[in-house]
Curated annotation (Swiss-Prot):
Name used for this protein in its record: Large ribosomal subunit protein uL1
Origin organism lineage: Bacteria, Pseudomonadati, Thermomicrobiota, Thermomicrobia, Thermomicrobiales
Assembly and oligomerization: Part of the 50S ribosomal subunit.
GO biological process entries: regulation of translation; translation
CDD domains hit by this protein: Ribosomal_L1
Stated family: Belongs to the universal ribosomal protein uL1 family.
Biological role: Binds directly to 23S rRNA. The L1 stalk is quite mobile in the ribosome, and is involved in E site tRNA release.
PANTHER family, alphabetized: 54S RIBOSOMAL PROTEIN L1, MITOCHONDRIAL, LARGE RIBOSOMAL SUBUNIT PROTEIN UL1M
Record's keyword annotation contains tRNA-binding: yes
Species of origin: Thermomicrobium roseum (strain ATCC 27502 / DSM 5159 / P-2)
Length: 241
């Protein structure tokens, strides 16, 4: 069991682990337990009632957070020719093809999202063993494989404006950044609602019974705040609709 420092243990005293907090209570409390001397990330952790061993129960999608995550993601685009020019003008941080592929194969991963033109996927495909487990592999399901170069600016803008990808891990959990300690309570709350609703809408048909088993929000260095699942899901639905 990991050993925690004095500040963490002091922060933990503020959390009643036997309670399940409402979203409003949780976002207020999570900022109080964020004790580090930097602008900590605030992350949403969800345990899903799925069996990740079955492909038809895996959860994956994207969500555009209304207030972003607190940082501008670095976007890489696999493209050549006119598509590369459009991507550069649209603000992509890295644009290329064979050169970028070689760098990634060599261990370079200094980017947060990757987009590929469809005609590049034959070359990009083998990178799946590197990018897939990090959630960076371009995928048609998440809109990051683009056929028309003229669609690139919209995709790049959306990612830089707060679109994030979510997917379950091998244990059926989803982890998603919903902001930073410096966000207002309302900004965190709205990002939380939009994220939860998007994940709820991504529920696979093969999943039976209750979809969400538990939800927690936590700062980078502090303890988690357990959420009341039913209340959070209902408030998220009402906010989005």
């Amino acid at each position: 069991m990991p050993k925690h420092g004095k500040k963490y243990l002091e922060a933990l005293k503020l959390v009643d682990v036997t309670r399940r907090y409402s979203p409003k209570e949780a976002v207020e409390l999570v900022k109080k337990v964020a004790h580090a001397d930097f602008d900590e990330s605030i992350d949403l952790h969800i345990k899903l009632n799925i069996d990740p061993r079955h492909a038809d129960q895996n959860v994956r999608g994207t969500v555009t957070l209304p207030h972003g995550t607190g940082r501008t993601p670095r976007v890489l685009v696999f493209a050549v020719g006119e598509a590369a020019r459009i991507a550069e003008e649209a603000g992509a941080d890295y644009v290329g093809s064979d050169d970028l592929i070689r760098q990634i194969e060599g261990g370079w991963l200094e980017f947060d999202a990757a987009i590929a033109m469809a005609d590049q996927m034959g070359k990009v495909g083998p990178l799946g063993r590197i990018l897939g487990r990090r959630g960076l592999m371009p995928n048609p399901r998440t809109g990051t494989v683009v056929r028309n170069p003229e669609d690139l600016p919209a995709v790049i803008r959306e990612i830089k404006g707060g679109r994030v990808e979510f997917r379950n891990d091998r244990t059926g959990n989803i982890h998603l950044q919903i902001g930073r300690k410096s966000f207002t309570d309302q900004q965190l709350l709205e990002n939380l609602y939009v994220a939860v609703d998007a994940i709820a809408r991504a529920r696979p048909q093969a999943v039976k019974g209750q979809f969400f088993q538990s939800m927690t929000i936590a700062p980078t260095m502090g303890p988690g705040i357990p959420l009341d699942v039913a209340t959070t899901v209902e408030e998220a639905r009402q906010f989005v609709t």
